[in-house]
Amino acid sequence: MCGNNMSAPLPAIVPAARKATAAVIFLHGLGDTGHGWAEAFAGIRSAHIKYICPHAPVMPVTLNMNMAMPSWFDIIGLSPDSLEDETGIKQAAENVKALIDQEVKNGIPSNRIILGGFSQGGALSLYTALTTQQKLAGVTALSCWLPLRASFPQGPIGGVNRDISILQCHGDLDPLVPLMFGSLTAEKLKTLVNPANVTFRTYAGMMHSSCQQEMMDIKQFIDKLLPPVD
């Protein structure tokens, strides 16, 4: 099982300031934890939204000479033709779907949940949104790619998220996941879901990281899709 069973500490959470009627589930990148992203969301929070930043389980990562680190699934390489950890990706997606189910049980409908992530976490958020039967409000995918892209149809996906809103962000100087992968991913996404709902934003001078303007764009995207209901 390579430890991919969410046997990780409980998520970092930014609770809603009043009754939570919407949620953002955001998945960190390779080797990171949810804490830094929880802090970032605390800086752009809206009162009725709960922000959930889970921590990946620790596992050996092929890309990093089998060193053990927090990782949602194994990464073998970062080029478009690298082998992919299909079993690990699918298992990780099931774990994210279980997190979404948990929020639904807590009283937040899935169509009031935005899934997002950075780098490896962004890749997992895209894969999960495109394969789940849970209708989601949107995806915010940062500095990432679509994993197992050959497993998707040539035309639009079936299922509940055909019209999902996707905000994809990428730095134009990203040395790890080059901008080209991001733009190829955006083009692929436009064939899988309603292309009018896919937004691809690039940030001048940004490397494999985030920036203030990107966080403001994310806030605008979240607040538009998850307005207060009361």
Swiss-Prot record:
Sorted alphabetically, the Gene Ontology BP terms of this entry are: fatty acid metabolic process; negative regulation of Golgi to plasma membrane protein transport; protein depalmitoylation
EC top class, in one word?
Answer: hydrolase
Catalytic residues, per the record, are S119 (charge relay system), D174 (charge relay system), H208 (charge relay system)
The GO molecular function terms of this record are:
carboxylic ester hydrolase activity; lysophospholipase activity; palmitoyl-(protein) hydrolase activity; phospholipase activity
What is a single Pfam family found in this protein's UniProt entry? Abhydrolase_2
| N6-acetyllysine modifications at | K224
Q: Which residues form a coiled coil?
A: none
Q: Kindly give the InterPro entries that the UniProt entry links to this protein.
A: AB_hydrolase_fold, LYPA1-2/EST-like, PLipase/COase/thioEstase
Q: What is its main location?
A: cytoplasm
Q: Which GO terms describe its cellular component?
A: cytoplasm; endoplasmic reticulum; nuclear membrane; plasma membrane
Write the record's keywords in alphabetical order, separated by commas.
Acetylation, Cell membrane, Cytoplasm, Endoplasmic reticulum, Fatty acid metabolism, Hydrolase, Lipid metabolism, Membrane, Nucleus
Q: Which reaction(s) does its UniProt entry say it catalyses?
A: S-hexadecanoyl-L-cysteinyl-[protein] + H2O = L-cysteinyl-[protein] + hexadecanoate + H(+); 1-hexadecanoyl-sn-glycero-3-phosphocholine + H2O = sn-glycerol 3-phosphocholine + hexadecanoate + H(+); a 1-(9Z-octadecenoyl)-2-acyl-sn-glycero-3-phosphocholine + H2O = a 2-acyl-sn-glycero-3-phosphocholine + (9Z)-octadecenoate + H(+)
* E.C. number(s) listed in UniProt: 3.1.2.-, 3.1.2.22
**Localisation per UniProt entry:** Cytoplasm; Cell membrane; Nucleus membrane; Endoplasmic reticulum
**Role noted for this protein:** Acts as an acyl-protein thioesterase. Hydrolyzes fatty acids from S-acylated cysteine residues in proteins such as trimeric G alpha proteins or HRAS. Acts as a palmitoyl thioesterase that catalyzes depalmitoylation of proteins, such as ADRB2, KCNMA1 and SQSTM1. Acts as a negative regulator of autophagy by mediating palmitoylation of SQSTM1, decreasing affinity between SQSTM1 and ATG8 proteins and recruitment of ubiquitinated cargo proteins to autophagosomes. Acts as a lysophospholipase and hydrolyzes lysophosphatidylcholine (lyso-PC).
Subunit architecture:
Homodimer.
Q: Which family does it belong to?
A: Belongs to the AB hydrolase superfamily. AB hydrolase 2 family.
Q: What protein name applies here?
A: Acyl-protein thioesterase 1
Its lineage opens with: Eukaryota, Metazoa, Chordata, Craniata, Vertebrata
Q: What gene makes this protein? A: LYPLA1
